[in-house]
Amino acid sequence: MKHSSDICIVGAGISGLTCASHLLDSPACRGLSLRIFDMQQEAGGRIRSKMLDGKASIELGAGRYSPQLHPHFQSAMQHYSQKSEVYPFTQLKFKSHVQQKLKRAMNELSPRLKEHGKESFLQFVSRYQGHDSAVGMIRSMGYDALFLPDISAEMAYDIVGKHPEIQSVTDNDANQWFAAETGFAGLIQGIKAKVKAAGARFSLGYRLLSVRTDGDGYLLQLAGDDGWKLEHRTRHLILAIPPSAMAGLNVDFPEAWSGARYGSLPLFKGFLTYGEPWWLDYKLDDQVLIVDNPLRKIYFKGDKYLFFYTDSEMANYWRGCVAEGEDGYLEQIRTHLASALGIVRERIPQPLAHVHKYWAHGVEFCRDSDIDHPSALSHRDSGIIACSDAYTEHCGWMEGGLLSAREASRLLLQRIAA
């Protein structure tokens, strides 16, 4: 099957949809056809809202934002009349011995960044605290990505200050945090409805297999979920997909785009709801615990549900538990919850319902922090444009997706005008 468009965007996450919105708002695109493809059956990308047990909205993907750190995202929420609620997990009320000393240790090490800030965070902390102490200190922050050799001490301080649970460690308590009252999927639906009303056509459930130049445009080969093959010709092309997806295409990524190196981290989120909110007996409502066991970060949302959130090795650990069977997975959660709370396992009931999500490439980022990286890329020969939060200083956040989309659409509008 063959069809064509003037403009094609591959990727219907927040970046791709925002690109479409910017383009359709411009007089330069008036009268031009626009087609959006995505491998998923629903738009949204890493925004994945879901109802848990028919009672509470949860986020299997992106789950929070800060107006101070993410002003463009806040503006989008307001523009599409999306209601926000306070994200309560911004303080560690219950701290381990190491966590009690964490803020002081980080403050004492901060002046050393000028001299050794380019070292890996583990190497940097080990230099002054010793290896064993450094490992314990970094583990107490709950984000195992901080152990990566690509994460410099300078980057680590920035990361810590931009995550709600541990922002106070670097004196960033003033940052407010919010979630969407009924899920960020509402924002996605709002943007999608706007671009659809403006004439964009969606083809969801199609995976991009390859792309090549074809005269003054591009020829895309795609495959549907049912194996149906599709050939699409377009004059202008934006790939609103992450680096891990770019690397699987025949577009010479990243060599012909930026020359930078990219990496990714797996993420795992598990949500559970119970007949009774048993954690209220321990005064844990709206509290987060960072623990030294495979659960890593445990969040107790009011009297509604609890969830845990892990990255790196522990994300893969939980994926393995799920693969071995649901009963074993739930028993592992129960065991580690009891250990974290210092209670016997029998005090923790079986959940009424649960849901989980493993993201093989949950966070993607540029591994070369010392280069001046554009927020959207253009292929040096073919001119294909690419956008992703991974190309911005807000990698892993929805804000980065919006910034990259803005730059990608600017590049294309500039090209159309010429």
UniProtKB/Swiss-Prot annotation:
GO terms for molecular function: metal ion binding; oxidoreductase activity. Belongs to the flavin monoamine oxidase family. Substrate binds at R64, H163, Y309. The lineage of its organism: Bacteria, Pseudomonadati, Pseudomonadota, Betaproteobacteria, Neisseriales. Binds 1 FAD per subunit. The gene is vioA. SUPFAM superfamilies: FAD/NAD(P)-binding domain. Its EC number is 1.4.3.23. This is Flavin-dependent L-tryptophan oxidase VioA.
